Amino acid sequence: MFWYLKKNTALFIFLFSGCLFGELVDGDTLVLHPITWNTSSPEGWNAQYKKIIQFPGSDGPWAKIIMVQTLKCDSTTKGDNYPCGEWDYIWNIFVNVPKEDTVETFSMGSFVTPYGKRLWLGGEAGWEWTYDITDYAPILKEEREIIVGNNQELLDLKFLFIKGAPTRNILRVENIYPYGHHKYGDLADDIVLQETKLQLLPEARGYKLKAVVSGHGHAGPRNCCEWDSKTHTYYMNGSELFRWNVWKDCGNNPIYPQGGTWPFDRAGWCPGTKVDEYENELTPFVKPGDTISIDYEIEPYLDNGEKEGEFRISHQLFSYGSPNFMNGAEIIDIIVPSSKGAFSRFNPTLSNPKVIIKNAGAYDLERVEIHYGLKHRRKSVYHWCGHLKFLEEEKVFLPIPNWHGLRRTQTFEVEIKKTNGVKDENPLNNILTSTVPLPKIFPEEFILEIKTNNRDRARENSFTISGNNGTVYYSRGFFKDSTEYNFPIELKRGFYEFLFRDDMEDGISVHWWNRNSAPEKIGISGELKFLKWDGEVLHEFKPDFGQELKFGFIVGPIP
């Protein structure tokens, strides 16, 4: 399926003989929809979808290329007996590119599915993840085979090609070390992924290294390499260039609860997330046309069996032209307020909006004028000051806007008006909207009921109830095991946030994973709920929440 959407309209243009009827202008989005809910689930163990896709040949340049991956639980999947796959399975997004009389395979990202037992994955709408794959523009042309997903969940896949000038033109993408599975010992002993020479593209003016690394297996006393943090390093011409640690905090995973040990940190991934990507700008260290030696290394292993663990790795080099804009800032995303599943841990809320901005211009970014608020309402203005070099990003907390009118419109807008005191050169990435999820409405008086768990775990918990002005109205910690607490709460009209923490990041649920090895350590689950004075439940939380719970609510009417 192939169509495009005119900016701010719903005009469909069909593909015929490789050409589009109609001309794309900056801001238009060309949509490819090769896999839908109706596409048959692949057959075979952990089988992937394979699709031949006709990508656009010449209708660029593309300001952005976004891949939208949506998964949902469905009994028609062929992987196992559950609507969603029972275990956490890793898969890649591969694109096969013709190269002389063979093909070269590029990985555009890696993903790990969530534990599927008793999993809610967005219901019929599914759960959405987005990938910015603009850097792969040189290979997303004409006919290509895409290999993606698996048969544990149903997959819906779209590619969005947004017409316009990118931050800098992407000239070439190369595999330094193509995607592969490697034993930790082989990596550390330099048996695989040895030093290699690269000829930098002479006509390029910028270069970037990208590594996607995830640890797997349960070797040695620290269960390497899924559960063990290791240091990874790039060397150039024999000298250390970039060093990073592969480790990911999973305690605030937005997909919860899951039927597995989802809250615990892992080597570069969590169940239900994309594998972390590590990008390093090579430009300051090289000159166009240089021949360089690149070597990837990992910290030495200990003689305890851990070398049998595994890493799944790809390393790529991207070559670019000069920046297309001198003064330019981009709104990458709106974290708060947002209805996106990825940000559900922070929403709903009517506290400070939180956005991500990026310097998309060659000049250092020092000032940004940001207008924001509800659509069709008077906007607030915030003057950000800081220092971001080209391509650097920052999360910005905006002062709380006027939420009056929220009953009539839940569309929130953020717009960059000026960068460094002048008009931004690229208006295409200056405005973004989100949907404001409405918080629950509570009475002025209610009860917070907490039933603690046992095995000395209650002391890990604490809570606060605070207002939009930052004032903490209620707080408590140092709970006793196996005890019921009832806190009478009385608040005036306004917006409030309840925060409940667990220091060990394992929620207040039972430790069910001890059922075979140490059943005496399973313990009991705690309970956490808000009640009216007559006992009616206002809101009840699931005990398997990981690190913390944030819950916003309104006392009084919606503004």
Explain the meaning of each model-derived region.
Residues 1-29:
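Bacterial Sec-dependent N-terminal signal peptides
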Residues 23-339, 344-349, 360-363, 423, ...:
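Extracellular/secretory-pathway and virion-surface proteins
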Residues 40, 299-445, 559:
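Extracellular/luminal regions of secreted and cell-surface proteins that mediate adhesion/ECM remodeling
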Residues 92-94, 233-235, 369-373, 462-466, ...:
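Beta-strand signatures of extracellular beta-sandwich domains
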Residues 109-113, 119-121, 248, 253-288, ...:
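Loop and turn regions of beta-sandwich accessory domains that flank beta-strands and are enriched
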Residues 135-141, 286, 403-412, 505-512:
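Short glycine/proline/serine/threonine-rich loop/turn segments at secondary-structure transition edges
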Residues 142-144, 290-292, 394, 408-412, ...:
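Exposed beta-strand face motif in extracellular beta-rich ectodomains
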Residues 194-196, 392-398, 432-434, 483-487, ...:
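Short strand-edge motifs at loop-to-beta-strand transitions and within beta-strands
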